[in-house]
């Protein structure tokens, strides 16, 4: 009897001790900010820097020593992109990376129906989650300014208010699945010609009334967890590391607590990347489609060049800790969230959602001259022009 009592007492003492030994950052019952600070305190300098840049075409490293997993991103706004090889743009040939092709976001905006936007986000978020993605690189809310912008199909039209009201439910739908939406391209990225070198000139009223409202609503109404910078420049600084747009407006005026991710190839300077609001660097020295330096991740602007500046005492770690806090916050909201659902792929519900959204987005146009339907007796050939005519995306 004494042995039994002793065993019970020992168990009663040991169980609380074991519970106390569980690190705060691994305890999902704790507030995220407590978990972030606990994890931050355990990281080495090298581990912190590794969190801020890519390790492959679409992923960034975690911290295996602490059980912090990698972050996996994927395109795109209206369908989950097939996986590519680790350091190449060729498709990996996986057997589980099909997806439902949802209508373009132009069509979604044309529904004028936030319920359809929520359904869209929920459905595509489930597909991203099933594929184990942490971040969905979309949606886009750049304002239509020219019909020649080849990426207009990724965006939600020319009305800032409509775009903002439609993007917020999409974000909430995606993030219900424990997948971060990544609203892009912040900001003023309204055409594709010379997109890496164009310095956009815009007055403050147009900036705040036309180009920023949808992004602001994405942050303050949608609660988005990540934002992607743009390729172009504003006030002479690239928008993936721009003091005014990222630090002053996004993180300052709007109180954004998430992660700023560079567009692929959008980072150009280590010191500006350190100080001007960029948190995670992806795709440097690549055009985002085919070209790129091979296995160059340790040489990214926020990789060894950043680490060396710290070691040499030329920059401090205040900015680094802020970046890492944001990245850890993202990780705890997504891949380390034990309550996120499993997701699903190619389900009848997703196909039905795509059909419903497509139907509601139909816009009736006047058929002048009876152009449609095409008379095959008169039109023997139809010309399809452009890269997508020959390339499988």
Annotate each PLM feature.
Residues 19-393:
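Glycoside hydrolase catalytic-domain context in secreted enzymes
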